[in-house]
Amino acid sequence: MWQINEVVLFDNDPYRILAIEDGQVVWMQISADKGVPQARAELLLMQYLDEGRLVRTDDPYVHLDLEEPSVDSVSFQKREEDYRKILPIINSKDRFDPKVRSELVEHVVQEHKVTKATVYKLLRRYWQRGQTPNALIPDYKNSGAPGERRSATGTAKIGRAREYGKGEGTKVTPEIERLFRLTIEKHLLNQKGTKTTVAYRRFVDLFAQYFPRIPQEDYPTLRQFRYFYDREYPKAQRLKSRVKAGVYKKDVRPLSSTATSQALGPGSRYEIDATIADIYLVDHHDRQKIIGRPTLYIVIDVFSRMITGFYIGFENPSYVVAMQAFVNACSDKTAICAQHDIEISSSDWPCVGLPDVLLADRGELMSHQVEALVSSFNVRVESAPPRRGDAKGIVESTFRTLQAEFKSFAPGIVEGSRIKSHGETDYRLDASLSVFEFTQIILRTILFRNNHLVMDKYDRDADFPTDLPSIPVQLWQWGMQHRTGSLRAVEQEQLRVALLPRRKVSISSFGVNLWGLYYSGSEILREGWLQRSTDIARPQHLEAAYDPVLVDTIYLFPQVGSRVFWRCNLTERSRQFKGLSFWEVWDIQAQEKHNKANAKQDELTKRRELEAFIQQTIQKANKLTPSTTEPKSTRIKQIKTNKKEAVTSERKKRAEHLKPSSSGDEAKVIPFNAVEADDQEDYSLPTYVPELFQDPPEKDES
C-alpha cells in the first residue's frame, strides 16, 4: 500500500514516508525547519486516506536524483563530508528511536567536533530530501538570486573605477536602458547586418540629444551597451531577428525530423530539382565552339536515395523539361544508357513506375497539365515553399556529391569568380567536353552512386536488418520486398503525352492549325474534316499536346475530357518548319512578321504612287475627251463596230513587228533525237500531272 520515500499530503502539509515497520509508518514533514520523524499506525493512515485528509503527491526533490557534481567541485566535497558524519546514524536500525538516536548524535558530535544542531540539521535534510547522498548537496545554484534583476541604489556608478581615460562614467538607469532598447531594436534586430559598434554610435547620437549637459567622457560605454544587449536579448532571438525568414527556416531553425522517416518505402516520395552544372561544354561537331553550362535535372527516391531519373541539356529549367526528367524516372533506362554506349541490365537501374508523391519547386509545377498527374495517374504533387532548398534537401545535396566526382578532373569547371588575377586564364576557355561525353560521365556517376555508394549518414529505421548495407540499390530491393512498394506501372508514351503542354487548336481545310502550322493525320482524313465544302461540320475548341523540342508531330485530343489522342504530322503546307523546335518557329515567325511589317510600309508607299498615277491618267483622259451632241443610243450601238476596228488595227500593228528584219534562207531546225515531226511533243496545252489531283495515301498511325 505504502512505499518508502513516497510523498503524501496530510492536511495540505507534505510528508515523506521514511520507513514501514510492524504496522507503523514513520514519516516526516518536508517543509518543517525543525522536528524529527514520527510514527503513525498504518491503519490510521488508511483512515486519513478514506477521509480525504491524506493524498499522494509528486516528490518536490526528485530532481536531486539527476544531480551529478564533478569530483573536484565544492558541492561534491561538501556532500561526501556531510554524508560521512551522519552515516553511523542512518545505518542504525534504531535510528528512529529517539533515545538511541540521541546517543548516536552525541557520538558524532564528539568524533567530528560539530554541534548537535548541525547534526540534526543534516539528518533533517537527509530525510526530507529523499534519503540519498544527493539529498545533502548544497543549494549553491540558488545563491545570488539567479535569473533575477538586481538594481543598484544611489547615484554612484557601480563596479570598479575607470583606470584609463577621463571621467568616471555613469550608472545605467532605467531611462538609459530605454535608449539602449530603442537603439538595439532599430539598428541591431533587423536584417541589415549592422555591427554593434555602429549601433553604439547611433546610441551616442540619441543620448546626446536627451542629455546634452553630460560630458562625452561620462557617456555609457560600449561595454555597458553590449552587456545590456547580451543580457536582455537571448542569442536565439538575436539570430532570428538578424536573418531573413526564409534563410532562418532553411539554414538556421532546429530540425525536428528527417525526410526518410516520412517515406514508407521505394516510390513513396520522389524529389525533383534542377541546377546549372558547374562546367562549360563545347559543341560535339565543332569543339572550338563553347556552348555554355548545361542544365541538370535529378529525380531521387527519398527512401532509398536512388537516383531514378535525370535530364541533361541546354534548355532552361521549366515545367516541360521537369516532366521530361519525370518521364525518364518512370521508364526503363536501358535504352537511354545504350544510346550513350553504356550497357546495363534492368537490375542495375530497377526504377520503373509511378511514385505516390512528387515534390518539386512551385515554378516547375505552374502548368495546368500537372493536374494530369493527379487526376489521371493518382500522383500527389507537392510544391516546396519559395527559396526553401531544405524542403528538398536530399536532391539538393545530391547535386553537390554528383559534381564532386568529376570536378577535380574535368576541364572547364567553374572556379570562383570570373574576375581574373594577373596571368590567370579564363576557365571557360579550358572547356573540351561535349554534352554527349558529359552525359556519359553523369550516367556512370549515377550508376556508381546507385549501386556501390555506402551512405554513412543514412538514418536507418528500427526494422532494417543489420546485414543490410546502406547502399541505394540494396535499400530499394529490400524496401520493395519488406515495405510498401508504391511504384505503379504506366505506359511510357501515354504518360509522356499526358504531361506535354497543351493549346487550343482550330481546324480548317488546310488541317489542324497550331501557331500557324498545319497538321494532318489518317484519323482526320477518315473523318472528312479536310473536305473543301461548306457542308462539313468541323469540331471546335479542341486541344492538342505538343513537344516544344520538335514541331513535326502533335497529339490531337478529339474528345473533350478524354486522354485518347491522334498523332498528327506536319503537312507540306508547313514544310519550311520541318525538323525545327517550336522556339525556332516562334523566332522565325517573329522575324517574318517584322519583315512583313516593313514590306507593308513599302507596299503602302507604292500603292499610293499607283493610285496617284491612275487618278492623273483619268484626269488627263477626261480632259482629252471632247463633249459630243451625238445621241447616247447611237454611241452605244457603235461599240461593236468600234471594237472590231480596234482589233483590226491591233493585228496590223502586231504583224508589223513580226515581219523579218533581214532577208535570207530560212534556217532548218534539226532535233537532237531526230524524231519525226509527228512524234514531237505538243506544248499548246498544259502538261497534266496526275499527282497534283490525287489524295495523299492514308497512313495507319496510332
UniProtKB/Swiss-Prot annotation:
Recorded consequence of changing K116A: Nearly wild-type DNA-binding, 50% transposition efficiency
Effect of D301A: Prevents DNA strand breakage and joining reactions
Subunit relationships: Heteromer with TnsA.
Annotated spans, Disordered: 137-160, 623-702
Keywords: DNA recombination, DNA-binding, Plasmid, Transposable element, Transposition
Stretches the record annotates as DNA-binding domain 1 (DBD1): 1-139
GO cellular component terms, semicolon-separated: chromosome
Name of the molecule in the record: Transposon Tn7 transposition protein TnsB
Organism from which the protein derives: Escherichia coli
GO molecular function terms listed in the Swiss-Prot or TrEMBL record: DNA binding; transposase activity
